[in-house]
Amino acid sequence: MGSKLYIRTFGCQMNEYDSAKMADILLSEKGMELAETPEEADLILFNTCSVREKAQEKVFHDLGRVRHLKNSKPDLLIGVGGCVASQEGPEIVKRAPFVDLVFGPQTLHRLPDLIDARRRTGRPQVDISFPEIEKFDRLPPARTEGSTAFVSIMEGCSKYCSFCVVPYTRGEEVSRPLDDVLTEVAGLAIQGVKEVTLLGQNVNAYLGKMINGEIADFATLLDYIHEIPGIERIRYTTSHPREFTARLIEAYQRLPKLVGHVHLPVQSGSDRILAAMKRGYTTVEYKSIVRKLRLVRPDISISSDFIIGFPGETEDDFEATMKLIDDVHFDESFSFIYSPRPGTPAADLPDNTSHQIKLTRLYRLQEKIQLNAQAISQGMVDTVQRILVEGPSRKDPGEFCGRTDNNRVVNFAGHAGLTGSFIDIRITAVSSHTLRGEISDMQ
């Protein structure tokens, strides 16, 4: 029996993708298989996220919970990867000497070598370098068992927003060559994948080298993926307003496989706060992108990110954000109270707003967006929606669920044979975060 691997993943879809790649490479090169619990494992990996406050303390807390396992299993290895590893580096081993491996998002492909070096030398191994796109050359071909898959097309971020730690933990923007991405997507299609989600910190900043030496922008990549047989839906996340080009907007007119949903983080509706955040656009420019998108795809769904309580945010600034929500009619949001990230410019800004005021603003914003979402969902009742059936419902395993083109989850009475298929569903009711439906007579 081979040795076992346990991975705990925190944070974004990029981390989910990276964790899957860790498992793939350790299966391919070390013959490891996944364990369901840390107690079963011979290697425990924490793939961490540093976006939120106290992320580092959360990691050390979780490390402390598995430390005792080494008492009964001396050969057990414990590793920390992801953005906290990149940010903290050797400090992790200083605070937790029982940690064996520390590696960043760009060095996960070196895990087999790090494991070998740890066993050979008996010393902890730390590698948080930024070897650009090398990791994709070392990773085994993508494997999947479902009808949906993530595909990372670029790494890092070069925008340096004043509040964000990502450029320091994942490095500058580096795009995979066009043919590498297309080969991965085509391979997934052969395995039965029908929907791909393209990933990147600023996915629409993609600039991939082509075989002829030219550079493919994000719209060109979408054109090529659209032609791959078997792929019926294309999603992507996360996009940046500064990179939302006219060519990308036009893609929504000519590419029917490109879903009718865009996640386009705005962060604030105040131009003064946007400037302090160093976002590089105004609210007028943001609304112009949305208006042009709706001209070519009138029913497109727009979701966003908001940071509440950025240093210096006044009530007028917050009201400007609420007005932007009214103007755009956002469908969904990921909204948080600002938390300073060490080493970022915004961490040094004075902050005189009380936590209670920030909480009140956050609740008001979330309530407004929830009302928008409910109104949009209510408008879908009695319509027929095409969904990709993903499998049993999380809340009720006796039911099944799928996702609409505009990213709504629909629960319905079905059977396992529908999993991985596109079906037509008549929407019958709206719940707080999902829709209910029944298989349409039009099937």
From Swiss-Prot:
Occurrences of domain MTTase N-terminal (ranges): 3-120
Cofactor binding mode and count: Binds 2 [4Fe-4S] clusters. One cluster is coordinated with 3 cysteines and an exchangeable S-adenosyl-L-methionine.
One GO MF term attached to the UniProt entry: 4 iron, 4 sulfur cluster binding
Protein name as catalogued: tRNA-2-methylthio-N(6)-dimethylallyladenosine synthase
Gene field: miaB
Domain Radical SAM core: 143-375
A Pfam family per the record: UPF0004
Subcellular location(s) of the protein: Cytoplasm
UniProt binding sites for [4Fe-4S] cluster 1: 12, 49, 83
Catalysed transformations (reactions): N(6)-dimethylallyladenosine(37) in tRNA + (sulfur carrier)-SH + AH2 + 2 S-adenosyl-L-methionine = 2-methylsulfanyl-N(6)-dimethylallyladenosine(37) in tRNA + (sulfur carrier)-H + 5'-deoxyadenosine + L-methionine + A + S-adenosyl-L-homocysteine + 2 H(+)
Species this protein is from: Nitrosomonas europaea (strain ATCC 19718 / CIP 103999 / KCTC 2705 / NBRC 14298)
Domain of life: Bacteria
Summary of the function given for this chain in its UniProt record: Catalyzes the methylthiolation of N6-(dimethylallyl)adenosine (i(6)A), leading to the formation of 2-methylthio-N6-(dimethylallyl)adenosine (ms(2)i(6)A) at position 37 in tRNAs that read codons beginning with uridine.
Keywords tagged on the record: 4Fe-4S, Cytoplasm, Iron, Iron-sulfur, Metal-binding, S-adenosyl-L-methionine, Transferase, tRNA processing
Family under the similarity heading: Belongs to the methylthiotransferase family. MiaB subfamily.
Cofactor needs: [4Fe-4S] cluster
SUBUNIT field: Monomer.
A single Gene Ontology CC term: cytosol
Primary subcellular site in the record, as a coarse category: cytoplasm
Ranges for domain TRAM: 378-441
Binding site for [4Fe-4S] cluster 2: 157, 161, 164
The enzyme's E.C. designation: 2.8.4.3
